[in-house]
């Protein structure tokens, strides 16, 4: 049986939740039925090596820019550079046909920052992923309200949370080809890696936050909340796992707030799961997101979640395994305070998270996406 060739198009392989979801998705796809690769628009992302080390082909147009003394290759590179530059001037039209070694069956536009035409390849089906909530994220809102002419050309549009699915359909008016598929989770891998040892103090309750150190993730307000709670005599520690543009600013803020002794910045960790496993609960303080993969990973480990993102509640199912607060400092602070001071309430959510952990079965979750890909190949 011929394998279905799927190319996922990414802007850059950075350390983020969407990229982790893509990594898990490709690793979980049935290798007997699918052959997956990633085309990156911008090279040298910090996670390129992670993908390639896992045997996932990473392709880009930059090979033709490498210096060479071979005159034949140099001429070929010059021609390719010219055609690549022309494709970029046309908003990516024809770029994949130049750069991909083989004709794809399905092209998946996996990132909101892609060039408009890059995913459309003659003879291939096209899928668009919506990771953010257009109801709260201005980038996805603009796309849903102003890019319908491009969006209509996709064979399928996939939203990764019900909140995003509802908002996108309402704002874009595109209901027929829009589907809801949660990001699959490599749950066995998460549970296995969570058992590795990490050096963390255990004298006080530990709160964990994981994500890209960027403004939209709300780590600044989380540090302020941590200070407020300490001032109220609620002793605890905070560990923040991740890297990003605010890597220097956030530790400086911690020093200014005089909380440097109770906050740990681990930097980027290829394996964040032991930090989550050792924590009393996970906090997701983002201003806007789709359905954070890290929240599902925490529940997979039986760790309750406190979040300002409404779509996180979708991961709870029918269990009381976390707390969704209003998207404000005051509300998030009250939620964290309750988790730290109300033992009965916390015990209820901890039990619910442990019950919910069995829901996150990667093989079951990826089957929906495999079925979608196969159904696309049956359409004309």
Where are these regions (language model features)?
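A conserved mid-protein helix/loop that constitutes part of the nucleotide-sugar donor-binding site
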Residues: 16-24, 205, 209-228, 245-252
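Short His-centered aromatic/hydrophobic patch
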Residues: 91, 108-114, 130
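A short, active-site helix/loop in glycosyltransferases that binds the activated sugar's phosphate group
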Residues: 116-118, 154-178, 185
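Acidic anion/phosphate-binding donor-loop and adjacent secondary structure
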Residues: 138-139, 166-170, 179-204, 274
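Nucleotide-activated donor-binding/catalytic signature segment of Leloir-type glycosyltransferases, i.e.
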Residues: 251-267
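Aromatic "clamp/platform" in nucleotide-sugar-dependent glycosyltransferases that forms part
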Residues: 268, 287
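Short hydrophobic beta-strand element within catalytic cores of glycosyltransferases
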Residues: 304-307
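Conserved acidic donor-binding segment of nucleotide-sugar-dependent glycosyltransferases
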Residues: 318-330, 338-343
